[in-house]
Amino acid sequence: MIEPARLTRTLNPKTLAVIGDVSRTNYRWLRCMSTFQGNIYSVQIDPKEIPGIEEMGIKNYQSLTEIPEDIDFVLVAVPRVAANAVLKDCINKGVAGAAFFTSGFAETHVQEAIDLQKEFTDIARESGIAVIGPNCMGLYNPAAGVRFGEKQAVGFEGDTTFISQSGGHAGDISAAAYANGVPVNKVVSFGNGVVLESADYLEYFGNDEQTQFIGMYIEGLHDGPRFTKILKDVAKRKPVVLWKGGMTDAGRRATASHTASLAGSDKVWDAMCKQTGALQVESVDEMIDLINALRLLPKFTGNGLGVTGGSGGQSVAMADTFARAGLRIPDLSNGSQEKLGSWFSLVGASFGNPVDMGSNREQVDVILDTLTTAENVDCLLVQVRPPQDDDEDRERMQTQIDSLKRLKSTTDKPIAVIAHSSTPAHDGSAIADLSKTLREESIPTFISYERTASVIQKVLEYNQNH
């Protein structure tokens, strides 16, 4: 059992060392850690590598024990055969924790590697050192400037922590979170998880006051009952979004060779999520969408949607998509329809629900106000078409944004935007700009009917159970 205080030092280091970085990778780990806010050291015994390290302004030592101060966190990038010796050096130095990028252990299914991992595990567990990995990317802590990718942003604090068995997914999740305005507290990539596994991180961050939302990517478990117990406890107190890899036969085979984990059946995982209150997703995009919605939307427990902004055909598509997700687009009351009808004389316009969007600010305001005040509408969804390279398009969208900002300041009902378009001219940058503008008003944006329906249904499910 790792002491929580030791794990806290590991995840929030004031000092760190990188062991084994080399010029072949252009000293990737030392470059990643160049943003670290504390003291950083290198340990490298190869004389050919030392000049390149010192040119970076980093002091190199021949041994970890030579470093003249206590070390909180170590990133280890040495060959597999040296891993156990380096682990012992970390223990002798009194290091709080270490992330082992080193791979080639039990995930290879080679007996020699399996035996080496067992020896590694026994040494670590006996000492009480907090080991992340092996076969992992380690830690991303933006506030401390600890990174495992050079493009990861730093210098901010967040309320969302991601725990990932996959290093690749950990990188993708951190990038997607930053791009979509989800403020990261920590990202931990734990790989084989021989000392600290998913349940340990979940328990720790479940008790972490800075972490209000948890996202997890898991391929398999060492102790299913313990994980389930902890998940049930944590999910009562904060949202836990779970993405399970290896849910198909092909995925289970890939899992075995990736992190040497037992994947388990999809039915077992589905049942566990329902039992514990965890929210299950199937991709990075869905995880980020859902966490953004949980962070930004006021709590609602009814499934009635007020929808506006689409054409006739789009309204039909939205109605079908939301209905399949168990959501309702209720008819508006006679009073609401009469209010809309008295304002508009547009040929071909629909004043039912979904409602066609108006063409000027006054019309847009009336439509949004009418839908928001309707008693059988619990959540408002507004389709906003990102502009093409056209002044009229930009003016139309700005009218909708201004009206949404006004509405947000006058209602407690949740509002979300669908930035849906099949037009190639509506590129990603336009949607990203729109999403950023609306996030500043606590209005989440989704880029398809399907993603919107999935997220709203899951948020509703969470709200109804908490």
Label every PLM stretch briefly.
Residues 1-466:
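Catalytic-core regions of core metabolic enzymes
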